[in-house]
Amino acid sequence: MRIKTTTKTEYQQRINVLVEYINNHLGEDIDLNKLAEISGFSRWHFHRIFAEFLGEPVGTFIVRMRVETAARLLRYTEIPVKEIAYKVGYDVPSSLSKVFRQFYGISPNEYRNNKDYVIMEPNRKCPIWN
């Protein structure tokens, strides 16, 4: 997709606002219509621009942010896994465990108990603002 420089900067600012909103509301249901509204884009344009700038669909981004946040909480706090699941937006702790294992190949408890285990982020397109 080819975007003019001024438009690209404006879009980048809108995406930054969305990323901040998502990170501040991980423990809540994140409504995609609300995100489109916050961005000022139509729902269709919002999905397209978000994926173009961040290299992944918005739903995938939200799940990844939830799992990465859970990993940090597991590593650096003593908060129980059940409570972490709720903090990052899962109604059922087993849902976090399932997604965590899909992303990292290890359960949240195994990750917490093995301090030598390092999670490597999957290869993905770097955000434009970096």
Predicted segments with their positions:
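Short, charge-enriched, intrinsically disordered boundary segments that mark the beginning
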Residues: M1-Q13
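Terminal helix-turn-helix DNA-binding modules in bacterial transcription factors
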Residues: I3, N16-N33, E52-V88, K115-N130
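Core residues of bacterial helix-turn-helix
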Residues: S39, V88-G89
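Short coil turns linking two alpha-helices in DNA-binding domains
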Residues: S42-R43, D91-V92
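Short amphipathic recognition helices of helix-turn-helix/homeodomain-type DNA-binding modules
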Residues: K98, R112-D116
